[in-house]
């Protein structure tokens, strides 16, 4: 069976850009157009070479020895995908077999191996974020790395830390870890470390400003929207998680489809050359999102290193911006040989750094079919066939971690009268299709492009097939001795009600990627808004009208409105189970029946009304004319906005109840590194980078080999007449404005992976003792927020910077948690000096500790005392 999702994506690219989503008329108050704001992205050339950091020195030394002996064809092969459907993976490069480098396999997704078999479908990123558990974040990364390696995948296309969740209706928010830069940063970094510990290259994405799905891609009818972001907001919010991912040593970065400040991300020299490779010291390689390359020479000069899946503007035509055209650009001199050498060296260095030159398996699965045999290159139409699926089981015992994450993410919003946990003999009436299976069968919807049965993940390329699914219905039936099930979204008229009955109502809200439209929602939640799908609100209200005790279970991609029913006296408890993956049922019953106390916390704010958000974060729609999406709210997204506007949400960021209670005591603050200056000490100088001959290679290096058996539509580096291409080298290429080959001075904010290493000096350590003061075992989360002094200018009143989670505490027992605060954590970005500015010695900084952004338990003032609130 062909991959329907990829076909849908191709169709969407070829379709007219002149029509608005069908649901637009129903949500006109949420879809708005904006005029151009005059934002532009200044040029920054040339692209900095990699290899100047000691942490990558060995990998670059190995890469240099190989790359210096490569032909032009071999170099181009490694930078260009072979074309969509031209191999087993969603993307693969060409090879350099003389040096033992195979076609590199790149594969989704951040939660499991996409379009495969015998894999684990882990909980989604938003669920992982809700655990506030660094150990689980790392463990999931390790097991993802093991599974991808076991399938022969070189590059895992995750984690996602963008979108960050600026727009609550954004379609792909659920792939990341939550609507806060530090939560995203910690979740992303822990995941990267875990993945790469297994020798698989992680890819942090989508760089940057892809906060809406609609109109994200440029095509023949319309340019992608431009995310217009000021410099301070870019650094303090949207770059923050990418910087931490780079500091964690990530091997690859994927660009976003959209533009930033009127320049496409895949050829934005400011973003790629200056910020990513110079300021943040990124040593790996930059790839496009699939079919997100919009130019050849321009993208190479701007810092792009790999084009995926390789096709040009229209896929499956056998044409590319790179491939043979990159060979031509090298021969005619429009792309310097030095730029190509750096592109290839970055890719090969990442391959070496992960140890993939050792015993690394080749792909043993196919994204294109579930059959054992089939065409090796399905996009060619006429393709040799062979074994494409070996059905290698990579699951091991990873279901244990998957269940632990799904369980520890469950967030208890409300528990009146301590109705939870339930007893096994309670009389239960269970309502809602979200409790049951997909009636069409497991994995019946390609890339989860439907909302049928329990919602385990959103839809799109960020999904994986479920190897199995234990539904809430199955799990409850297995445990409860007295449960009746009504797997319908319309409240039945014939339900018998007894005085002791507990109604458990399941509702959901879904979203996903733009190439699939589900129930009128083209990725973003346009038709549904922030409401529950499938009559969910009415189902809860109808149950509340009949039963005196109602428990609501919510599976959702993000914030969901609850005002229609949350204050009804019958609605006693609400659990948000997020997107639990394959362990949806068991993880829920672990908490529902009290084997574990809930310990999840909201990774976003739940508002009382959608109008509580700033108007600038609504979805935008403007057919034909390019959309200008200007970030006028600046630093104030999610809870930061609610605090600034003095709006009380329904449930604040970080909120989460337990079956027990906790006290915070004995807060302490200690100085680790004295901050004796406003700005960090001078950055270390760059080390040497690999050097190569810069002469244009002989055209014969990209001539077609004799008796070569070509695959139709496969993207090769070869030219029919390479000598003719070389003869055109005297022509002057129309380079981008500001293009130069003269290197820029090293930015003062750089110096290592993630920036100036002094930014990550630990300035303070804060400790607090957490005690279980209740009657049941449980785990607590301490959230650390900083409040910066007025001397730094206007800043959000509280910003999450760290968190820590206790082990399971028995009643009456305690644990002391310690969290570290870096110089960067208490800094703001100085747009004039272009560096991070902190108060000297941290004077005026307050450090808040609590269980949510609105539930503070202790505060420490730098230079003063700590106290319990």
Curated annotation (Swiss-Prot):
Active site: 289
UniProt region (Disordered), positions on chain: 677-697
Molecular function in Gene Ontology: beta-glucosidase activity
Alphabetical keyword list: Carbohydrate metabolism, Cellulose degradation, Glycoprotein, Glycosidase, Hydrolase, Polysaccharide degradation, Secreted, Signal
SMART domains: Fn3_like (SM01217)
Protein location: Secreted
This protein's GO CC annotations: extracellular region
Glycosylation site residues: 77, 261, 332, 364, 399, 478, 728
Enzyme Commission number(s): 3.2.1.21
GO terms for biological process, alphabetical: cellulose catabolic process
InterPro entries the record matches: Cellulose_deg_GH3, Fn3-like, Glyco_hydro_3_AS, Glyco_hydro_3_C, Glyco_hydro_3_C_sf, Glyco_hydro_3_N, Glyco_hydro_3_N_sf, Glycoside_hydrolase_SF
Recorded catalytic activity of this chain's protein: Hydrolysis of terminal, non-reducing beta-D-glucosyl residues with release of beta-D-glucose
A Pfam family: Fn3-like
Residues spanning the signal sequence: 1-19
Bias kind Pro residues: ranges: 681-691
Pathway field: Glycan metabolism; cellulose degradation
Role, per record: Beta-glucosidases are one of a number of cellulolytic enzymes involved in the degradation of cellulosic biomass. Catalyzes the last step releasing glucose from the inhibitory cellobiose.
Similarity-based family: Belongs to the glycosyl hydrolase 3 family.
Protein name as catalogued: Probable beta-glucosidase F
Species, as recorded: Aspergillus fumigatus (strain CBS 144.89 / FGSC A1163 / CEA10)
Lineage summary: Eukaryota, Fungi, Dikarya, Ascomycota, Pezizomycotina
């Amino acid at each position: 069976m062909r991959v329907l999702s990829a076909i849908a994506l191709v169709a969407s690219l070829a379709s007219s850009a002149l029509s608005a989503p069908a649901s637009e008329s129903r949500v006109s108050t949420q879809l708005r157009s904006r005029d151009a704001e005059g934002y532009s992205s200044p040029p920054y050339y040339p692209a900095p070479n990699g290899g100047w950091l000691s942490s990558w020195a060995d990998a670059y030394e190995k890469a240099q020895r190989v790359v210096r002996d490569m032909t032009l064809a071999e170099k181009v092969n490694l930078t260009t995908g072979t074309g969509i459907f031209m191999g087993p993976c969603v993307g693969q490069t060409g090879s350099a077999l003389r040096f033992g480098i195979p076609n590199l396999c790149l594969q989704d997704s951040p939660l499991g191996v996409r379009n495969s078999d015998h894999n684990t479908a882990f909980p989604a990123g938003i669920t992982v974020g809700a655990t506030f558990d660094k150990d689980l974040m790392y463990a999931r990364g390790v097991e993802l790395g093991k599974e991808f390696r076991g399938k022969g995948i070189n590059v895992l296309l995750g984690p996602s830390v963008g979108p960050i969740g600026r727009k609550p209706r954004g379609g792909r928010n659920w792939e990341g870890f939550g609507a806060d830069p530090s939560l995203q940063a910690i979740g992303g970094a822990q995941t990267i470390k875990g993945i790469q510990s297994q020798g698989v290259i992680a890819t942090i994405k989508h760089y940057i400003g892809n906060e809406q799905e609609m109109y994200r891609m440029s095509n023949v009818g319309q340019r992608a929207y431009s995310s217009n972001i000021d410099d301070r907001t870019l650094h303090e919010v949207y770059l923050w998680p990418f910087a931490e991912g780079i500091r964690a040593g990530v091997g690859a970065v994927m660009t976003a489809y959209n533009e930033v400040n009127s320049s496409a991300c895949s050829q934005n020299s400011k973003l790629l050359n200056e910020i990513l490779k110079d300021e943040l010291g990124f040593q790996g390689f930059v790839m496009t999102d699939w079919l997100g390359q919009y130019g050849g020479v321009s993208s190479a000069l701007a810092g792009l290193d790999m084009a995926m899946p390789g096709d040009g503007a229209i896929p499956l035509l056998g044409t590319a911006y790179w491939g043979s055209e990159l060979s031509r650009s090298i021969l005619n001199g429009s792309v310097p040989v030095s730029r190509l050498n750096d592109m290839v060296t970055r890719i090969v260095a990442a391959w070496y750094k992960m140890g993939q030159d050792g015993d690394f398996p080749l792909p043993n699965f196919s994204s294109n079919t579930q059959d054992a045999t089939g065409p090796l290159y399905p996009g060619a139409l006429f393709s040799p066939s062979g074994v494409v699926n070996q059905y290698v089981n990579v699951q091991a015992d990873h279901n244990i971690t998957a269940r632990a994450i799904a369980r520890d993410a469950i967030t208890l919003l409300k528990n009146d009268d301590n109705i939870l946990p339930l007893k096994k003999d309670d009389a239960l009436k269970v309502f809602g299709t979200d409790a049951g299976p997909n009636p069409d069968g497991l994995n019946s919807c390609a890339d989860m492009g439907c909302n049928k049965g329990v919602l385990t993940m959103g839809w799109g390329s960020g999904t994986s097939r479920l190897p199995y699914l234990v539904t809430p219905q199955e799990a409850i039936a297995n445990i409860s001795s007295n449960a009746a099930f009504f797997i319908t979204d319309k409240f039945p008229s014939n339900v018998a009600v007894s005085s002791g009955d507990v109604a458990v109502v399941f509702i959901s809200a879904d979203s996903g990627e733009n190439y699939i439209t589900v129930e009128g929602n083209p990725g973003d939640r346009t038709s549904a808004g922030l409401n529950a799908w499938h009559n969910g609100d009415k189902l809860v209200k109808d149950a509340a009208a009949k039963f005196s005790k109602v428990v609501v279970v919510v599976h959702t991609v993000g914030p969901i409105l609850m005002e229609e029913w949350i204050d009804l006296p019958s609605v006693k408890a609400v659990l948000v189970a997020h997107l639990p993956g394959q362990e949806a049922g068991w993880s829920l019953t672990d908490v529902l029946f009290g084997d574990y106390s809930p310990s999840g916390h909201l990774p976003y704010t739940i508002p009382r009304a959608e109008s509580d958000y700033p108007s600038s974060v609504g979805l935008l729609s403007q057919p034909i004319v390019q959309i200008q999406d200007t970030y006028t709210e600046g630093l104030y997204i999610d809870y930061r906005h609610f605090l600034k506007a003095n709006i009380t949400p329904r449930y604040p960021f970080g909120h989460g109840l337990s079956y027990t209670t906790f006290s915070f005591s004995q807060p302490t603050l200690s100085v680790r590194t004295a901050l004796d200056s406003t700005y960090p000490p001078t950055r270390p100088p760059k080390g040497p980078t690999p050097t190569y001959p810069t002469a244009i290679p002989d055209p014969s290096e990209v001539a077609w080999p004799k008796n070569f058996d070509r695959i139709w539509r496969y993207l090769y580096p070869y030219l029919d007449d390479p000598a003719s291409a070389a003869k055109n080298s005297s022509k002057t290429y129309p380079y981008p404005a500001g293009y130069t080959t003269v290197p820029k001075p090293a930015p003062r904010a750089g110096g290592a992976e993630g920036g100036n290493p002094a930014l990550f000096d630990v300035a303070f350590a804060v400790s607090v003792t957490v005690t279980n003061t209740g009657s049941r075992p449980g785990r607590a989360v301490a959230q650390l927020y900083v409040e910066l002094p007025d001397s730094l200018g206007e800043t959000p009143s509280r910003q999450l910077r760290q968190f820590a989670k206790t082990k399971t505490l028995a009643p009456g027992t305690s644990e002391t948690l310690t969290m570290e605060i870096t110089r960067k954590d208490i800094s703001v970005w100085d747009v004039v000096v272009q560096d991070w500015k902190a108060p000297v010695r941290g004077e005026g900084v307050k450090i808040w500790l609590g269980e949510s952004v609105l539930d503070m338990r202790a505060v420490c003032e730098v230079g003063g005392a700590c106290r319990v609130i």
